Amino acid sequence: MAQQTPLYEQHTLCGARMVDFHGWMMPLHYGSQIDEHHAVRTDAGMFDVSHMTIVDLRGSRTREFLRYLLANDVAKLTKSGKALYSGMLNASGGVIDDLIVYYFTEDLFRLVVNSATREKDLSWITQHAEPFGIEITVRDDLSMIAVQGPNAQAKAATLFNDAQRQAVEGMKPFFGVQAGDLFIATTGYTGEAGYEIALPNEKAADFWRALVEAGVKPCGLGARDTLRLEAGMNLYGQEMDETISPLAANMGWTIAWEPADRDFIGREALEVQREHGTEKLVGLVMTEKGVLRNELPVRFTDAQGNQHEGIITSGTFSPTLGYSIALARVPEGIGETAIVQIRNREMPVKVTKPVFVRNGKAVA
């Protein structure tokens, strides 16, 4: 039996089509995925992300532990509330999960991890935390709502009290603050400004209804996927998994190589991969009729005349741009064009950076 978030009843009241998503009943859409997508790009939309796992870590050696656990370096986190995106790697350099870590105090940090990887993440974290004496608290008492779009912060702020409005005033991206019952973070998965708000389960439904009344459109998993793909954001299990290096998933920027003497899980394997080269993640654009889909082969000939093949990891029709886009993992040496096999047709595609839309505007 699939689990339900505290907002399940609100989704059904809003007319959602519910689907099983990694063991959770979640809204796919509320009538029109396209309308929901455009609401986030032009105004304000919201997503129930309560299926994600919030984990609080306490102990005097928490920073030391996270410097070992994660490929990015929490030594960068010096201001309370600052957040960092990182891969959590296995010994062979594969990605166990990608996550966000928040620094509150020297003995309190918070992780937000994916729902699909919850059990293995908690097992891995618990196993490696033991020698550091870390107290691990899974915050199943909290729900989370992502409010995203150019007007999202202003509309959400109408629900805040004076102290909460003051707490978030001027807050830069990738920060979080606890203000009363709300943990408000300037993070998201859409390429738009907004907040991700964690709050007690029993208060989630009232907060959701108030956001609807404030003019924020409920959005489902369908729009969440097209928005994140336009923004060039990875989805665990597609762009990366335990067999794929972060270097092959456009996550090289999240690896803190310096200081060179910091030992983190997977470092040795990554250094070998960096030296010998890996595949890389690129963007693909197809303006001709048709849709680029996951797992389609991508073929190209390099400058030396050698033929290579890669694979589309995520593909869709872009509602913002009006044509098909994809992320693809390909060998090094790809040029500005490639061929994608769609059924029995060879379709030309343009190779771009793996990001297509930011703040409502085309990047590619």
Curated annotation (Swiss-Prot):
Entry annotated with the keyword Iron-sulfur: no
Coiled coil: none
GO cellular component: cytosol; glycine cleavage complex
E.C. number: 2.1.2.10
GO BP annotation list: glycine decarboxylation via glycine cleavage system
Xref: Pfam families: GCV_T (PF01571), GCV_T_C (PF08669)
PANTHER family noted in UniProt: AMINOMETHYLTRANSFERASE, AMINOMETHYLTRANSFERASE, MITOCHONDRIAL
Annotated family: Belongs to the GcvT family.
Name this polypeptide is given: Aminomethyltransferase
Source species: Shigella boydii serotype 18 (strain CDC 3083-94 / BS512)
Lineage of the organism: Bacteria, Pseudomonadati, Pseudomonadota, Gammaproteobacteria, Enterobacterales
Gene this protein is translated from: gcvT
